[in-house]
Amino acid sequence: MSAAREEAALAILLELLGTPAAPISSASVRRARDVHIADSLSGLEIERLRAAARIADLGSGAGLPGLVVAAKLPEARIDLIESASRKCDFLGEAIARMGLRNATVVCQRSESWAEGDGREVYDAVTARAIGRLATIAELASPLLTDGGVLLAWKGARSEEEERELGRASARLAMEVVEVRPMAPYRGSRKRHIHLLRKNGPTPNELPRRPGMAAKRPFGSE
């Protein structure tokens, strides 16, 4: 996809985010270009994401960052994992309207997907504003290949969440590589991307039953 087509695809996404079908608030629509899309694009500063051949976007929702990454990385294969049917419908429409040939909607829980075709096949997993770090790491681990990476978009750093993740890391076969401060848009403060790497085979206990990673995250004991 040429640069012009990439920009055209993102313009279509902005248009779609302004429709009633979009799973995003009206306030978020007004901030979509300057905040949400800019924030999504910031992940491309991380080389491991740019180099990934197969990427999963966890809890894709409105496709931020998944649709943005798909538009900017046309050679990569992107699976948008989302369990809510209305959001899946939006993502499917967006893929068609944006002309993305490299993106697919996986309309099921990530835990279920990780028990089948999604197990240990992704070079990178992206997740933006979907939960606690330990929860995100647990959901990502069974999807990632050994050595694959998780990029978790977060706001201000939380000592509590980072300690919880530290206690859970060995159990999840995940290790923290970097916590990178980001400034994706004017006036942005306290934005971070947490970069984690899978450091072994998926533990046998993963994935747990759907919902358990959020309800009782490892490391919270």
Specify the residue positions occupied by each region the protein language model found:
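S-adenosylmethionine
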Residues: 73-79, 83-221
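Short amphipathic alpha-helical segments, especially helix-boundary/capping motifs
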Residues: 14-21, 69, 139-144
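Conserved SAM-binding loop of SAM-dependent methyltransferases across substrates and taxa
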Residues: 62-75
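Conserved glycine-centered beta->alpha loop in an early N-terminal alpha/beta scaffold
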Residues: 59
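Class I SAM-dependent transferase core
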Residues: 1-56, 86-103
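Bulky hydrophobic/aromatic packing residues
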Residues: 2, 33-38, 55, 69, ...
